[in-house]
Amino acid sequence: MNNLRQRTLTGLGWTGATRLLGQILQLAATVVLARLLSPKEYGLLGMVLVFTGFATYVADMGLGASIIQRSTVSDRHLNSVFWLNVAAGTLLTGLFALAAPLVASFYDEPQLRMLTVVIALNFVFGSLNVVQIALLDKSLNFRTKFWIETVSSLASGIVALTLALAGAGVWSLVGQSLTQTIVRVLMLWAQSSWRPALAFDLSAIRELLHFSGHLLGFGAVIYWSQNIDKLIIGRWIGSSALGIYSLADKLMRLPLYNVTDVTTSVMFPALSTIQDDVEAVRRAYLRAVRMISLITFPMMTALSVLAAPAVLVVYGSKWQASIVILQLLCFSGMAQSIYNTAGWLYLSQGRTDVLFRLGLYSTTVRVTGVLIGAHWGLMGVAWAYVIGGYVFILYPTWSRAGRLVNLSFTSLLRNVEGPFACATTMGAVLWASDRWIFGGWALDARLAIQVALGVIIYAILVRTFRLQAWVEVVHILLARSGGRSRFLRWAAGHEA
């Protein structure tokens, strides 16, 4: 157990560093690209990605996750998964090439025809690394993954900026996507000793599909739950509106990607190794949820309160329409950071059948809400997303997962109430100071001082009230420093 805990913490560190640095590199590229490109050009790519993103779930078929979850896998499984994914990727590329005119017609955007054909090449390239990624994650070898993601993000950003400066418009975003996929594949193959043999065993696929079949179904339905808003905006409101909405959505998801997704990539394989020890799973799960809420709640709160200076400083005045959308989506993001973790329990316990049914339910809620909200434009869609997440999805999704490990919804709320209270207090102080003290300051100075103020206030609050998650994080860092850090001893409430 101690070895697993150590490997999990190491994995969290490397995965966190991977995602953080990757997001910093991508954010830096996006800051420049947003000033060079228009909302319409971002919206055009977003229209295509709605469909290709869905096909990405289908191409993987959940088999990569099945390799991670299965206690033992043989070359028979690995070879079969590899060749099936290559076949699926090639087929999807061909299908999208044929369907490109239909995509362009659906949105009434002729430019989408060639964009769809080129972006679909990602399926062929991406199918070559499914097994290698699964083996890396299964072995908790996140240090190697760090370098792969860092180099691929850096290379793709350079390509995108070069194309944008050359006047390539939306094609600079396409080049960024393809470059990242290709570089990632090359580096994964370079580091992996596993090579596919010319062998395929249908029975091996059937063994894996027992787990991945429902997971594939869940991935498909939850994808539309998370992206139906973009499809409807692109079809009925327009590409410029989709560009505005997509940028706000991307900013909101930065904390989610850097915290929740990072933790998920480590917690799923870690919990799978102790799936038969319900008490151990429950303890590990609650510890992770506490840490997630400790980080995501203040980030979402601060981003919502400081949305105006953040958008105007980082992206420029032509993206001003995304400010209010960002504020609403951040409110939804706090709930997402918690109910998304329910998937760890379903996956680690092998209950993808229940996960699939809940995915159908949440997708129905999202589709219904967004269709109604679209009558009031972007604001209506954003409100539908928020209301659906809190009122109809949070409790049903999580409470069923908690039963798998004898964990009540009330117990979950008790574990996140401290970070929520501290984050809300911090947000109130930031809002008041922005309104009555810093409102007239220059935007960049206003943003910088408010971010610093938010960090200080939140740190004081969590230390003063000794939140359990705060103490756990500090003790982990203190142990890793050998107890020598006076600051960490103070943060933990010990005498310096």
Regions found by a protein language model. Give the residues of each.
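Signature of the first transmembrane helix
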Residues: L4-L63, A87-L102, V117-N122, S152-L161, ...
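Membrane-proximal transmembrane or re-entrant/amphipathic helices at the cytosolic face
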Residues: G402-L412, W431-A496
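Interhelical loop/hinge segments that connect adjacent transmembrane helices in multipass membrane
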Residues: M1-L4, T8, R143, L186-N227, ...
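Membrane-interface junctions at transmembrane-helix termini in multi-pass inner-membrane proteins
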Residues: R5, S66-D75, V124-I148, A166, ...
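Helix-loop junctions and terminal segments of transmembrane helices
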Residues: Q26, V58-D75, N79, A134-K138, ...
